[in-house]
Amino acid sequence: MNSKLSLSTKLSSSGKTQLAEYFATPPFKVITLPSYDDAWANGLNAMQMSSSPGVLAGDLLEIDISLAKLTALSLNTQAFTRVQAMNEGDSAMQTTHILLAENSRLFYLPHPLVLHKDSVFKQQTQIEMGEQSELIYGEIVAIGRVLNDERFAFRQFSSHLKIYTLKDDGKKRPLVSDCIQWLPSKMNLTALSQMENYSHQGSLTYLNLAKNNAEIKQQVQALQQQSTEEKDLLIGISQLNEYGLMVRVLGCRAEQIQKLFEKIGRLLKSV
C-alpha cells in the first residue's frame, strides 16, 4: 500500500499555531489536541494516528511536514509501529521530509518501532532547517518481540537521518548524518559496542540554530548530570559539531526510553 501524510502549519491572527494544510491517505490520520501547559507558548499539539495493524510487505509510507515561520508543533504518535513478517525478497519503506522555516520549532517523537520476525524495513529521514529554527527529533526501535523470544529475528533494518541548514542563497549545508544498518544474518549485533544484551535502542537529536557551542555545552552537561539518575539504561550524550547534541540510549523497555525522551524534550523546550 502507498500511504501519504502531509501537513503544514500557519500562524493565526492571534499568534497561535494552526494546521494550514493537511492531507492523509489510509491508514494515516492526524488529530489536534487541546492546548496544554508547554514552554513553547502558542504552539500546536497534535497526534499522528494509524488504523493499520502494522507495516506490511510492499508498503511505501511517505510523510511530509512543513512548519511556517514562527510556528511551533509538538507531534506524537498513537501507538507502536509494528513491522510485520514478510516473505523473502519483500520489504517496506518509509520516507520522511521535514522543512522548518525561520524561527519555527518542532518536537517529533514517534512511538517505538517493533521489528517482527522475517521483516525488512528501510527508512530515510531528511530535515531542512531555516535560520534560528529548533528541532527535537527522536527514534526508538525494538529488536523484536522479546517476550515471544524474538531477538534479531528480522532480516534487515536501516535508518538514514540527514539534517541540513538552509542558507540565504538557497543552498543546503549538512549538520547531521546518522545511519543505522542492521543485518542480523551477517552481523554480530550482540557484540560489545553493539546492542549487547539490550533489546531497545533510542536516538534523540536536538538542534537549535539560535544557540552557540557554549550554550549547547551547558545543556549537554546538565543532561549528563540528570542521566545518572536513570536506572537500567545505558545513556550517552554527545555534543555535535555545531548547534546541537545527540542522545543515544540502550535499554530493555520501550516505555522507559519513551518517557526519558519526553522528559528530555520538556527540559530542552524550556531552555
From Swiss-Prot:
Compartmental location: Cytoplasm
Keywords: Chaperone, Cytoplasm, Nickel insertion
Gene Ontology molecular functions: nickel cation binding
Keyword Chaperone: yes
PANTHER family: UREASE ACCESSORY PROTEIN D
Main location: cytoplasm
Species of the source: Haemophilus influenzae (strain 86-028NP)
Pfam families cross-referenced by the UniProt entry: UreD (PF01774)
Origin organism lineage: Bacteria, Pseudomonadati, Pseudomonadota, Gammaproteobacteria, Pasteurellales
Job of this protein: Required for maturation of urease via the functional incorporation of the urease nickel metallocenter.
Family: Belongs to the UreD family.
Cysteine pairs bridged by disulfides in the record: none
GO cellular component: cytoplasm
Protein name: Urease accessory protein UreD
InterPro entries for this protein: UreD (IPR002669)
Gene name, Swiss-Prot/TrEMBL: ureD
Oligomer status and interactors: UreD, UreF and UreG form a complex that acts as a GTP-hydrolysis-dependent molecular chaperone, activating the urease apoprotein by helping to assemble the nickel containing metallocenter of UreC. The UreE protein probably delivers the nickel.
